[in-house]
Amino acid sequence: PSFPRASVDASPMISLKNPDLQAPRQKAIAAMRASLSPEQWERNAQFVAQLRQEIAQHPVSRHPAIARLNSGTVRREAMEQIHLEYRHAIVQSFTDALLAAQMQSRQLEPRLAPGSKMAGRFLLTLNVLDEFGFRPGQDAQGYYLGNPAYAHYPLYEDVLNAYGISNEARVNHRPSAIAREVRAFLEDSYGRYTDVATLLAVAEEEVILFSPPLRKATGALGLEVNDGYYYVHGVSDDDSAEAADDDHEDDLWFILTQALTDADRESLRTLGLRYCDLWVRFWDHQMTLADGATAWAKPGAETASA
């Protein structure tokens, strides 16, 4: 299906002699908005707002695991297991999904005007730069600032190092069925732009929900959480930290707002809520495993194990 879009003939030639490079996120969002008619953008934005509200009210948003982790009474064995499971479910494949979305933005054309895919790719790139370890600014040679060691996935591996989880244990870890299902559900979306954008936005919401409790439970064991992975995840309300999860989530919803057609709505709503359902089962399973191993400490009990 197609819908009215902004004319591509009315814009003057872009000049590079005096480039305007300020506020890149806002410029990308404005360009995405301009690629649709005002009426279509508004309809899409209303749908996205309704879907976000449904997700905010979904049981995953108040899962008991949040309170249990925040209690700081989770034993080390359980936390090691949870981090390995979470690694398989989302950490290892998250940037794969971002790159899949960048590629599949090609599906916007020719339904939208030539070049319309680039604003979305630009916005996704800002997310990817953070994930890959780049930072705003220029180095001493006037080049980009960045270090692959600061990419979020390697930073997560450093958390496993802090827990004392060996490389052999990581390789030999057998993810639970639900961890495999959560991962596969995202990976199966890679072929369709609207699908992967929807699930990435939901995944960011899960990161925002569960990173602070995971950080708190990790810190309660005496592990460092004021640097590394938990310095960029789990501290969205800390101005001194480098978290950008809220911006990333908003960006992905803007991506979806541009990409939507009227015919997509019900299928994407179902897709997003099914992914939330899987995350409920994922956290149910983590708690069940931990309870079965008597790994959730009683209030007041020693939280660090030998």
Predicted regions and their residues:
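Non-heme di-metal
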Residues: 11-306
